Regions:
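Conserved catalytic core of sirtuin-type NAD+-dependent deacylases
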Residues: 1-190
Length: 190
């Protein structure tokens, strides 16, 4: 937040550059498999810490983006959130109120995660009997605590990851490898 306060033009220049880089890429097999898994398991609650929007682009609806989305803006004047795939500058007006007070709808270091997103996750964690953890270090909270919470209630933890670093929870099933290789195979089995 401090960098944005000091030089919003520079921050927007960086985010516009990142949006262009991401736009050149496509969702991978893991993103598409996640969307298929959600279709087969309607009770699935999908969350991501990524801000690239690839899950939604792959067809996964209702995903909770914990850290926001690089293709959205949030107005500091009226709090309106809007999709914006175009370049943004400090002079870009908000589509809701017309004021030029937009920032990326991204959670920056030192900021709290969106309360509504966290509440939806914790509500589901209280009743779920299993959690699938995919491609994360498992060390950044609060997300690292999700598996801990499920395990505390004697739920099952299934993890897919390329490294087997120590996690603050025990896995029932650990599948070592790339999510893009493993998730599609899981979807085929369901």
């Amino acid at each position: 937040p401090q960098a944005f306060e000091r030089d919003p033009a520079l921050v927007w220049q960086w985010y516009n550059w990142r949006k262009r880089l991401i736009a050149e890429k496509q969702p991978n097999a893991a993103h598409y498999a996640s969307a298929e898994l959600a279709k087969k398991l309607p009770e699935l609650l999908a969350t991501t810490q990524n801000v690239d929007g690839f899950h939604a682009l792959a067809g996964l609806t209702g995903i909770l983006e914990m850290h926001g989305n690089i293709y959205r803006t949030r107005c500091l004047a009226c709090a309106a959130i809007a999709e914006n795939r175009e370049d943004v500058s400090p002079e870009t007006p908000c589509s809701a109120c017309g004021k030029a007070r937009l920032r990326p709808d991204i959670v920056w270091f030192g900021e709290a995660l969106p309360k509504n997103v966290l509440q939806a996750i914790y509500d589901r964690l209280r009743s779920c009997d299993a959690i699938l953890v995919v491609g994360t270090s498992g060390t950044v909270y609060p997300a690292a605590g999700f598996a801990v919470e499920v395990r505390r209630r004697e739920g099952h933890v299934i993890e897919i990851n390329v490294d087997d670093a120590h996690k603050p929870y025990a896995n029932d099933i650990y599948l070592r490898g790339r999510a893009g290789d493993i998730l599609p195979r899981i979807v085929e089995l369901i």
